[in-house]
């Protein structure tokens, strides 16, 4: 029997479930923490097959956005994290007591980056099916701009148990400062990912940007030699440089969509 719930009720129930799962991960041993990134996917399975039960109908799967659509969104999904994170590490290499460790071969490093992007995208799929595949389309009752901003904050809060708990994700430096910078970074990056998903109508640009973000950060961190906590403050997922750049792109995207909406309203009058 299919349970009929509005998109608003479905989305709020999903958020409760996925946050509860994230908190529940604190009770599991370190060896099980790899499941953390799959809690959004597990929440989707609960919603689609046990609660709403739309997983037994084609329409439930269509809303996930598995079809390859869009064009420029894929290029943006690669370029934006490369520039934003690359700029952060470049500032850190030149401005603080650290050292860039040149790899034996930059060509091999580029190949590693491509491989990491592919693997990172596959790893991010568990999250993106939940956030951008399932939740975002059902979150549009808030409006496009409000939903993108709120979704970014929801996504950031989902990471908090991993940062504040014993797992000590992003553990260098002052934890509360790192948490603040990380929240801003995830909110802004989330807005960008949401916009690429909504503009393209496909989950895959979101998956690609998420995977590229993680891959670029991993590769650049591996060629950075430093034990200073300033690395967390300047570069990477909690760095102020990526926060500014991701923020600028996110604000530009939101303003652009607001202008398009106003133009469509004025043309319809």
Residue ranges and their predicted role:
Residues 126-157, 198-202:
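Membrane-interface helix/loop boundary segments of multi-pass membrane proteins
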Residues 24-36:
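Short, hydrophobic transmembrane alpha-helix segments
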Residues 163-176:
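Membrane-interface interhelical connector segments
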Residues 19, 38, 78, 82, ...:
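Residue-level signature of the transmembrane alpha-helical core
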Residues 211-269:
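C-terminal membrane module of polytopic membrane proteins
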Residues 1-16, 237-238:
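N-terminal membrane topogenic signal
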Residues 2, 34-77, 82, 89-105, ...:
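Membrane-helix interface linkers and caps
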Residues 173-235:
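Functionally important transmembrane alpha-helices
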């Amino acid at each position: 029997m299919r349970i009929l719930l509005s998109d608003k009720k479905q989305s709020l129930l999903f958020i409760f479930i996925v946050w509860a799962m994230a908190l529940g991960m604190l009770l599991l041993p370190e060896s099980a923490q790899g499941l953390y990134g799959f809690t959004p996917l597990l929440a989707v399975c609960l919603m689609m097959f046990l609660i709403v039960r739309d997983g037994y109908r084609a329409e439930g799967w269509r809303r996930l956005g598995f079809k390859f659509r869009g064009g420029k969104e894929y290029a943006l999904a690669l370029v934006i994290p490369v520039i934003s994170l690359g700029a952060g590490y470049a500032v850190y290499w030149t401005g603080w007591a650290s050292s860039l460790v040149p790899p034996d071969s930059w060509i091999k490093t580029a190949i590693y980056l491509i491989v990491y992007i592919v693997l990172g995208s596959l790893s991010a799929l568990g999250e993106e099916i939940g956030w951008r595949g399932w939740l975002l389309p059902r979150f549009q009752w808030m409006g496009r701009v409000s939903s993108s901003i709120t979704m970014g904050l929801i996504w950031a809060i989902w990471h908090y148990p991993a940062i504040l708990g014993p797992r000590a994700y992003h553990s260098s430096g002052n934890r509360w400062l790192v948490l603040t910078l990380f929240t801003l970074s995830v909110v802004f990056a989330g807005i960008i990912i949401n916009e690429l998903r909504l503009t393209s109508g496909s989950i895959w640009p979101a998956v690609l940007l998420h995977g590229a973000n993680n891959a670029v950060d991993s590769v650049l961190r591996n060629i950075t030699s430093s034990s200073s906590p300033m690395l967390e403050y300047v570069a990477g997922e909690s760095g102020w440089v990526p926060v500014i750049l991701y923020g600028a792109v996110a604000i530009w995207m939101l303003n652009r969509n607001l202008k398009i909406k106003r133009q469509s309203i004025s043309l319809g009058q």
